[in-house]
Amino acid sequence: MRAEWIAKRRGQSNVSQMHYARQGVITEEMHYVANRENLPVDLIRDEVARGRMIIPANINHVNLEPMCIGIASQCKVNANIGASPNSSDINEELEKLRLAVKYGADTVMDLSTGGGDLDTIRTAIINDSPVPIGTVPIYQALESVHGRIENLTPDDFLHIIEKHAQQGVDYMTIHAGILMEYLPLVRNRLTGIVSRGGGIIAKWMLHHHKQNPLYTHFDDIIEIFKKYDVSFSLGDSLRPGCLHDASDEAQLSELKTLGQLTRRAWEHDVQVMVEGPGHVPMDQIEFNVKKQMEECSEAPFYVLGPLVTDIAPGYDHITSAIGAAMAGWYGTAMLCYVTPKEHLGLPNAEDVRNGLIAYKIAAHAADVARHRQGARDRDDQLSNARYNFDWNRQFELSLDPDRAKEYHDETLPADIYKTAEFCSMCGPKFCPMQTKVDADALTELEKFLAKDKETVSQS
């Protein structure tokens, strides 16, 4: 779809959407996004120029259907997939991708660390994906030195980052905010450093006693991103891994650095979003969102959860969707889903489905609470179908139509029950929605009540 759009940009030194927006240019991607979001295209351009919205759209991802991430648009959901050395392969990951897109993932991150040739897996995912693809290049950098963290060099990082950009990755998590001087701040944490990328960088700094190479070479990464229009997803390496560690000095120190890096990328017209926690008690979620907006000049916030309790392994798609809904309400732009397997193992296709639906619920609830234009229309349409016992329409409007129909048909599978004015919960005699009060009856009742009130007042 984008081949013709991109052809005229090739060879330019900066092809980012922010670069064009700041020149007053409205790109084809901006027009496409405006139509999807039902927003004025001038607003899209202005938000991208300001940095409050990104359109992750690598010029080498030609089959991408452009979307946006920002506070002015609908709250988005990311789904993580990826093969590991112990489980899964390319075919399983492609099936997860298709399921994620089917159930509404706005972006997908390939977090593969093994299970086959990483370049082959990534390229297949990009070529098969209509949604933006994100990656964490440090994983492949570590694999390239066979897990020997101390052998990694800045050039290793830059080589892998450019390779991902050339392959068409739309945004990358770059763990540039964790600095050497912040490492002692994790001493009093219960769970230390829980970011995989952050842990790799921390071990590198502890071994070499040198500053984070992603920080010292940040300008080199900017130059790569400009050439391909890759968006930064600035990784929160020191995000809290439990409630005890939430909003501590380590987390907030890194956040301040992420804000500085955001503005440095903006100086070169490179798009940025900022990643956030993690595990956060409900009473601290608003603070975390507002603090990010303050430190990072309102760059889009992209949070993992956050989980609001640590005691429910196997159900962390629920514990985190609670926090995600609140974070979205307070202004978070994109929610990274959590599956039931979080903290327990690699998610399978069914886990992807369950995690994604939980997060589509959270994002939609946030949009309704923020009074986004048209956000509640689908709710009202489904409620109308429910009141009128239009079962097939209810299924159609559901976030997961297959699951809704499956549960209905467990007890009433015959087609005749698709027009029945009851379900198996109440049966044919006790469903309250059968109580249809017509307008004439209400008019008569109002007359009676008015007359009764008049009689009482006269007495």
Swiss-Prot record:
Pathway: Cofactor biosynthesis; thiamine diphosphate biosynthesis. Keywords: 4Fe-4S, Iron, Iron-sulfur, Lyase, Metal-binding, S-adenosyl-L-methionine, Thiamine biosynthesis, Zinc. GO terms for cellular component: cytosol. Its EC number is 4.1.99.17. [4Fe-4S] cluster binds at residues 423, 426, 431. InterPro entries: ThiC, ThiC/Bza_core_dom, ThiC/BzaA/B. It is an enzyme of class 4 (lyase). Zn(2+) binds at residues 279, 343. Its cofactor is [4Fe-4S] cluster. Substrate binds at residues 80, 109, 139, 175, 195-197, 236-239, 275, 302. It comes from the Bacteria. Binds 1 [4Fe-4S] cluster per subunit. The cluster is coordinated with 3 cysteines and an exchangeable S-adenosyl-L-methionine. It catalyses: 5-amino-1-(5-phospho-beta-D-ribosyl)imidazole + S-adenosyl-L-methionine = 4-amino-2-methyl-5-(phosphooxymethyl)pyrimidine + CO + 5'-deoxyadenosine + formate + L-methionine + 3 H(+). GO terms for molecular function: 4 iron, 4 sulfur cluster binding; carbon-carbon lyase activity; zinc ion binding. One of its GO terms (biological process) is thiamine biosynthetic process. Belongs to the ThiC family. HAMAP family: ThiC. Catalyzes the synthesis of the hydroxymethylpyrimidine phosphate (HMP-P) moiety of thiamine from aminoimidazole ribotide (AIR) in a radical S-adenosyl-L-methionine (SAM)-dependent reaction. This is Phosphomethylpyrimidine synthase. The gene is thiC.
